[in-house]
Amino acid sequence: FESVKAGAWYFDAVLEAFRDELMVGMSETEFSPGAPMTRAMLVAVLHRLAGSPSVSGKMPFTDVASGTWYYDAVLWASQNGIVAGRSETTFAPQENITREQIVAIFSRYTAKFSPDKTTAAAELTGFADSASVSDWALDDMKWAVAYKVINGSPSDGKLYLNPQGNATRAEVATILMQYRAL
């Protein structure tokens, strides 16, 4: 990919995610590491990580049309309790996904497929913005930090979780590779 240069902090993660067919490019030559990750993209990655199991049944979300590239992934994730919609009938597939939403989804994925790896929890006091983690995501963030799925980003001599921030494709590739190392 033209946008993924050797030596970039995300280079190895993007290479591994692409090589293992967990993430795809935005085109044949562009990965777009700085582009925001959407809810549909993340669910597709996890569906691939699970081996792209076949699905059947009724889609609960009216904004996920049959035939879209993410349809099977959303149906699979919904049926397995890995994702919830923005409402009972809306998934918002093109909505950017935040870092705390990502760790919540990875935590649910782990509870479903590797429940033995859900017991640890870390304190978040080492992160300057730990108070900004939403209450609903607090246990998931503690889990992600304990298992080093998320390490935080350094700035001004402090570490930040940036839980409300939209995740980039490079960040998700990195989180994915750290998750696979569990």
Provide a role label for each language-model segment:
Residues D12-V14:
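Thiotemplate assembly-line natural product biosynthesis machinery
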Residues Y147-V149:
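Short, charged, amphipathic alpha-helices and their helix-cap/turn boundaries
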